[in-house]
Amino acid sequence: MKPRIWTFELRKGSQVLEHFSCTCPDCHRKGDALATRIGSVDCYAYNEPLNRWQKMGTYRGHYMFTDGFGKERRIKDDYSGMATMRKEVTV
């Protein structure tokens, strides 16, 4: 079975940063990479039956940190502290 191709936009506020068509896992990679570089970005997908854009979620980036003992941590988005790194999807 062929994976479904969707049309996505990554936005920061009302500004469109990227517009592309791909599968959902590819969108996760692009959104995470962009959010890691410039901060949180919103992901919108085009809903063809409704003929409109729908917000799918917000990518916040990785903000990873490895401490002196080799433990991976994630800096919180507001830089208020540290959290232990977990594998998770933010969308």
Model-derived features: positions:
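A short, exposed loop/beta-hairpin motif centered on an aromatic-Gly-Thr core
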Residues: 14-26
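A short, charged, amphipathic alpha-helix used as a generic interaction element across diverse proteins
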Residues: 23-42
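Short, mixed-charge low-complexity intrinsically disordered segments
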Residues: 36-91
